[in-house]
Amino acid sequence: DMRGCPVMVISGNTTMVHFLLELDAWTVFSAPYAPVTSNPGFYSGKELEMDFGGQIYFIPAISNYVGGDIVSGLLTVDFYKKEEIGLFFDIGTNGELVIGNKDWLIAGAGAAGPALEGDISKYGIRACDGAIDTVKIYGQDLFFTTIGNKKPKGICGSGIIDLIAEMRLNGWVDISGTLNPEASGRVRYLEEEGQYVAVYAEAEESWDGTPLYFTQTDISQYLDTKAAAHTMLDCLLESAGCTAQDISHYYLSGAFCAHGNLESAITVGIFPDMSPERFTAIRNSSLDGARTLLLNRNRMEDIEYLTEHVYSVQFASMPDFTIRMQASKFIPHTNMEDYPTVQKKIDERKNTRERHTI
């Protein structure tokens, strides 16, 4: 019974908190970009017209776009207390990043797009029963698994990343993401779409007898989202005077990060070409952080420290952001020297295909 609870902790982005408090949310993303509050503090259940007898604490935001959900998420990691540099990346439709150590912290945020959560393509769906969640390609053959082991209804974010990564490794698409119809019979021109598509589930494989496919346009839209995520990371590293190699550990938050294949995410160029041991995935860091604070009030000191010491940057105001994004609209990147492991895999798969055709 919530009415008997003494305290509730809420962590959310600045816009959602404004909605909950019935404040003007337009102030968050309209000039002069000054939210009504970034630190609501405590409210009673009665003030919010909730059937709750205790106090409700809202975790404060760092800026308009780096909200209390990110501050809460940082409670689940500890790089802001260490000498080594760490990086926290909450990635979904929006991307929020924090980089630093015990001496300095820099945050940034921007729109990534819906592709990483499956919300592109005619057959892109959220993670649910019947969603294709993993894809493997061997030569011309494609294999997949679905959530719940059901016949496929569509493909979710983790499946899309696998699909694009595997197509790149096996020559179904080139570095620009252009489909290659000579690579497999599953890559074909579809009259009703007016373009080439990659069929990942034939009609006899799907739940309703409809072939499921990813179009050339879908790939382009995906690369826009992927490029935004990569460019935000790239710009934040430059703002901090760091390279990807300088980061001792990457903390990845969000459903996509918890369920997606890290190697595929590196292959398509979302994340830098690093050893998997340098990455930790956290499913719901905002919820975990709120729980941590609820069970240990001493962590309020961390909340105060983070909101006072994190410097926020604006990616959109960086003069070369658009140029960097264009360079990132490749698989994995226009500069393959930054992705030696991916290049090695591409070469190995190509050699395997050539041996099988001799």
Predicted regions, residues:
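Phosphate/ATP-binding catalytic cores across multiple sugar-kinase/actin-like superfamilies
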Residues: 1, 70-73, 223-245
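Nucleotide/phosphate-binding catalytic cleft detector across ATP-hydrolyzing
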Residues: 1-8, 13-87, 214-221, 319-358
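Short glycine-rich phosphate-binding loop at a beta-alpha junction
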Residues: 2-13, 164, 245-254
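Short glycine/threonine-rich loop-to-helix capping motif typified by GTGT followed
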Residues: 14-27, 242, 254-274, 315-324, ...
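Glycine-rich phosphate-binding loop of actin/hexokinase-like ATP-binding domains
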Residues: 27-45, 72-75, 80-159, 261-283
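Glycine-rich phosphate-binding/hydrolytic loop that grips phosphoryl groups
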Residues: 48, 60-77, 223-227, 279-316
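Catalytic phosphate/nucleotide-handling subdomain of diverse soluble enzymes
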Residues: 101-103, 238, 242-307
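Gly/charged contiguous loops adjacent to phosphate- or pyrophosphate-bearing nucleotide/cofactor binding elements
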Residues: 161-225
